[in-house]
Amino acid sequence: MNNRLIRVLATCMALVLTAKLGTIQFQGHKETWYNLDMSKVIERTDKAVGMTGLYHVREDGVKCYGQFVIVAADPRKHGRYTLVETSLGTGVVLDVHTTDDAELIDIATAWGKGGNK
């Protein structure tokens, strides 16, 4: 199968983001994943919400804050603490990404090599 056909099938089947897929289209936005140390993001968020202990990594390797998937997004499109729908569940914007793609949602995971925290 060629890459174009795989992408069409993935879109039609509403696949969820995986480490192997790397990038998918979901409900009008592009999703990718990243694996960085989240300790500074979590520290800042804990201070902002006045709580601690909400950070955890799900069994599938997705990093979460409470019930929400941690995502990075363009702050001009999605402000910090905004909720966004992702292929892996409802996400909360706790981080920003450094691309110019306002439609990109970058999902924090423990996949591959990286921060794992």
State where each predicted segment sits.
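Solvent-exposed, well-ordered loop and adjacent helix/strand elements within mature globular domains
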Residues: 18-117
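Gram-positive cell-envelope targeting signals
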Residues: 1-20
